[in-house]
């Protein structure tokens, strides 16, 4: 039974929303950007979502469900709701009741995650979701830590778990010149993931500087100042490289 009433309210910290999004999962989607992230990516376009509280609003799950139900007629057969951030798994426990209700209402769920948080709540969250968008920042462990200040070990273990339980996922890779746009690292990633059956597609995300102004507003240094955005030739070369290992590759 699809009803927006919850027996127990777990407030969720929401940073912002995007209606009719087309870049975060299949079809038209309501994208819910959640507050809080455990990574410190040098290129982060949403630095205002990192702090657990920030300028977010404590939101009742009913509010998000009602918004999803209002937009459901536009989702069609492929669309739905994507939870992004920030890092959604920071609030896994709070999200589980909402995920259950969304599924009862026949709404497709994506989770856009760095895969570095893994516990029983996250397992349940991923099990309920229809599709995981797994952000692999870098395959090389040293360069991953330089780029995010965190290890990529759990991200890779999470991918192994998704494969083992038969959960479909997409792999997303931000192509940062000099940091992740490195041929040997992409080939290592390809050799590692090339045989994964649950990996449905690879998305190359071009590096951009659209969030740089937020750093200035927050009084923070943007540490990739001077790094130029990808040229069309660089994106074509990267796609050709990924194509050697994966059957379905897109530049998003």
Outline where the language-model segments fall.
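Conserved AdoMet/S-adenosylmethionine-binding subsite of the radical SAM
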Residues: 69-73, 77-80, 85, 89-210, ...
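Conserved alpha-helical substructure of the radical SAM core
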Residues: 7, 47-81
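Auxiliary Fe-S-binding modules of radical SAM enzymes
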Residues: 2-26, 177-252
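Canonical Radical SAM [4Fe-4S] cluster-binding loop centered on the CxxxCxxC motif
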Residues: 16-18, 22-59
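Short glycine-enriched, charge-decorated loop/helix-capping segments at active-site entrances
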Residues: 48-54, 145-151, 219-227
């Amino acid at each position: 039974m699809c009803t927006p009433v919850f027996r127990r309210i777990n407030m969720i910290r929401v940073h912002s929303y995007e209606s009719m999004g087309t870049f975060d999962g299949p079809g038209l989607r309501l994208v819910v950007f959640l507050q809080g992230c455990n990574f410190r990516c040098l290129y982060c376009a949403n630095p205002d979502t990192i702090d657990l509280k920030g300028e977010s609003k404590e939101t009742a799950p009913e509010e998000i469900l009602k918004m999803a139900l209002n937009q459901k007629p536009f989702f069609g057969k492929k669309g739905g709701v994507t939870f992004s951030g920030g890092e959604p798994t920071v609030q896994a426990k709070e999200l589980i009741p909402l995920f259950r209700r969304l599924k009862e209402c026949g709404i497709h769920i994506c989770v856009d995650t760095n895969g570095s948080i893994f516990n029983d709540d996250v397992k349940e969250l991923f099990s309920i979701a229809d599709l995981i968008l797994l952000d692999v920042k870098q395959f090389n462990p040293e360069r991953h830590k330089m780029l995010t200040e965190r290890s990529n070990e759990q991200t890779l273990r999470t991918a192994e778990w998704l494969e083992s339980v038969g959960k479909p996922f997409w792999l997303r890779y931000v192509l940062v010149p000099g940091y992740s746009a490195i041929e040997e690292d992409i080939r290592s990633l390809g050799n590692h993931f090339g045989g994964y059956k649950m990996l449905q597609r690879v998305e190359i995300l071009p590096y951009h500087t659209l969030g740089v102004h937020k750093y200035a507003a927050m009084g923070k240094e943007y540490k990739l100042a001077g790094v130029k955005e990808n040229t069309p030739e660089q994106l074509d070369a990267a796609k050709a490289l990924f194509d050697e290992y994966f059957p379905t590759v897109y530049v998003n």
